[in-house]
Amino acid sequence: MSTRPLDVLGAPGWGEVDARGLVQPGAKEWALDWWVGASDRWRRASQEAAVRQSELGAGAVVETRMKVPDGDAVQRVWAVAAGGGPAVAVVQVGNEAATAFAAALVVEAPGAALAVDRTGVAVGAKPVLAWDRAPVGAAVGHGAVKALLDAEGGTATGLDHKGRDLAAMVWPLPHTARMAVSASLGRGALPPPADLPDADAVLRGWQVHLERGARIEVPDDALARRIDRNRRRWLGRTGRMETADVAELCELSVRLDHHGYHDDAAVVLDEIAARWTTEAPTERLRAFGVHHDLTGDQQAAIRFAEPVAEAVEAAARMGAEVPLAPVERLLIAAGQDRAAQDLRRLDVRPAATPSEGLRAELVADQGEELLVAPGYRPVWRGGPLAAYGLPTRFGPLSYAVRWHGPNPALLWELDGRPGPVPVSLRAPALDRSWSSDQPTGETLLATSRSLPW
């Protein structure tokens, strides 16, 4: 079953919520399921057919709805940092039905001892759930849990565990009422939900983080949502780098840099540099090279010169490919001219440029040329496309494509870094005859019959 991540930018600890609303920490020591006692029986979200899920705010809040008589039971889950500490999930259940029902949270921790008191649930000695409003009933162990559920909301079926590694808590929920618990995703303090940001605050906070990167506007709502969702997930992964191998970290760093999250990418690169490994030398060199090309940060180049040199040596020993031009540019910027000369003499294979996904459709560089919207899709014709602060090797690029009848108009601004020759801009996917060496401008492009529209 598919899962959605629960993580917080820069905070340790993480978890997952599956397609039915089952919540687990990353280590999977326990699982939290939700049930609703309505009418004549309990409905377990993980077993009901009428369950659907959606994401709010690029996936910062996951909403799961379960059909009950006269409406829906709605679960919302989001992750926050607990006072600067580890990630904590807030699990909220609300009644959007016309009649009251009972909500139950069921914790399963195979092989562990569970304990419930007035403030929460512990697995072993570790608190895993906390609440502000105590449940009206709680039980530990298969028999006691079944008796509680039978008494509070009708017949309960589908309990999987037979021992004391099962606990259940029940809250009555009148029409429009909600209850919530906080669930530990790491090791550290576990405040109750009232002491943590609510869903609206989390949505606003993530929007602020997303807006730190390059702004991209595409004439496709589904693609726009996917861009934001991917960005949120990349940023969230910076809080759980210990779960990723070096190649995965390199890919994460490149994606962050491509979308303008350079400070976050630098944090990932610091983690890569600290691992002192010989694995994935090509990927490491690409990540360091992309960061330098897209930021021009000389201090970062100096800081990363040593791990870059080590990765070059590892690549030479292993016969791995090396992205020669980006690495050479980084070494020269770091004042390592001798190392750059040695790189040119090495008998290594040059690395091909891998696919860059959506970014390759928005911008690309070829030598001293910058291609604007090189992958413009025919289905976008007539719709607005824009990018603001898109990182390139020549500096941040902003542009917009607007349509005037059959002709596209292009507005652009390149905040260029000093270079030996002027940068030439072209837009071959829109007008193969157009080019300009001006850093800013606007023009009405001609359409070509050879273009795919």
Label each region the model flagged:
Residues 1-227, 247, 265, 336-453:
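Terminal accessory carbohydrate-recognition/targeting modules of carbohydrate-active enzymes
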Residues 158-162, 208-334, 340-342:
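Substrate-binding groove/exosite segments of carbohydrate-active enzymes
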